[in-house]
């Protein structure tokens, strides 16, 4: 909850930033229509986890995916017409690093198995669409970029697919070439937030954007390839509605020309699910269990370029 509180403060601060009255310009920019095409390369690391319980088992199974790194290219579109703002982002990358820690427990809470597997042949993907309004904009002396504050609301689809190979630990070990487990996390989220650009000097400016995620829907498909007592289409399915999260990014930008700008910054995403349901698809039938919680974080620095038409 500490991360959620920090993100809430960021969004509130974006809406309350005071600016000197001398710099205010209540009129819209001279261009009624502005289109900006941008590209980023986001160097990320991530973690995902889920905890499952069942009747008589306060803690049945924990799966933790750690260090699932990816270099994520992003393409983003920004359309501003008078005071209306539209944003779209599309990105994804290949994951070829990381580990899976898989633990199972008895009804008394004792750990009955623990394995560690390597991650490969995985990927991350996201697409988002936001609309909003430019509530304030201004011109600053000795700066070529305008400042602004936008309020935003939108939707994001975020997928993390992981595949674990082999396994070391107890009660058994598996060869490293054998596909052991795959998890496919699919987050669908509503988000609200704000962003600002603050001119500093000449072409230099600072941008900050923050979103709160008040609601999300999560589906996780889990396949256990080495268990003969489970189906593989999938072996388990987790579903939860009502999660919470937040996303924030900050960057320093420099406008090389009136059209071309570069940026360097950092981006952090996190979503945590509400309690949900898990269905285990056995070869002899299905069993209902409880998804206690699932969580995904992805974060890291980025570099980008922007072209304003």
Where are these regions (language model features)?
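Transmembrane beta-barrel strands of outer-membrane/channel proteins
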Residues: 35-43, 79, 88-94, 133, ...
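N-terminal entry module detector
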Residues: 24-94
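Extended, basic/helix-rich recognition subdomains
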Residues: 253, 261-263, 273
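Residues on the lipid-exposed face of transmembrane beta-strands in outer-membrane beta-barrel proteins
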Residues: 75-81, 127-135, 142, 153-155, ...
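Short loop/turn motifs that connect adjacent beta-strands in outer-membrane beta-barrel proteins
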Residues: 24-33, 78-85, 136-149, 200-206, ...
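Short gly/pro-enriched beta-turn/loop segments at secondary-structure junctions
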Residues: 146-148, 185-191, 198-207, 243-245
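Extracellular/periplasm-exposed beta-strand and loop segments of Gram-negative cell-envelope proteins
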Residues: 45-70, 92-127, 156-189, 214-249, ...
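Cleavable N-terminal export/targeting peptides
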Residues: 1-33
């Amino acid at each position: 909850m500490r991360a959620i509180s920090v993100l809430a403060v960021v969004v509130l601060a974006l809406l309350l930033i005071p600016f000197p009255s001398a710099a205010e310009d209540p009129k819209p920019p001279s261009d009624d229509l502005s289109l900006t095409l941008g590209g980023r390369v986001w160097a990320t690391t991530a973690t995902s986890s889920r905890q499952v319980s069942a009747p008589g088992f306060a803690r049945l199974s924990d799966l933790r995916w750690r260090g699932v790194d990816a270099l994520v290219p992003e393409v983003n579109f920004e359309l501003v017409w008078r005071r209306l703002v539209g944003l779209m982002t599309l990105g994804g990358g290949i994951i070829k690093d990381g580990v899976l820690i898989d633990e199972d427990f008895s009804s008394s809470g004792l750990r009955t198995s623990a394995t560690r597997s390597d991650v490969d042949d995985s990927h991350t993907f996201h697409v988002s669409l936001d609309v909003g309004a430019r509530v304030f904009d201004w011109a600053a002396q000795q700066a070529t970029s305008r400042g602004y504050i936008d309020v935003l609301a939108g939707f994001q689809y975020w997928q993390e697919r992981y595949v674990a190979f082999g396994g070391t630990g107890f009660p058994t070990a598996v060869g490293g070439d054998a596909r052991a487990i795959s998890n496919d996390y699919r987050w669908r989220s509503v988000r609200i937030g704000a962003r600002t650009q603050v001119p500093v000097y000449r072409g230099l400016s600072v941008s900050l954007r923050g979103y709160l995620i008040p609601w999300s829907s999560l589906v996780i498909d889990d396949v256990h390839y080495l268990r003969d007592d489970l189906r593989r289409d999938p072996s388990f399915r987790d579903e939860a509605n009502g999660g919470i999260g937040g996303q924030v990014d900050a960057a320093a930008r420099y406008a090389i020309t009136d059209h071309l700008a570069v940026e360097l910054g950092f981006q952090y995403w996190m979503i945590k699910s509400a309690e949900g349901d898990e269905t285990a698809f056995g070869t002899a039938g299905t069993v209902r269990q409880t998804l206690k919680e699932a969580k995904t974080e992805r974060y890291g620095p980025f570099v980008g370029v922007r072209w304003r038409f």
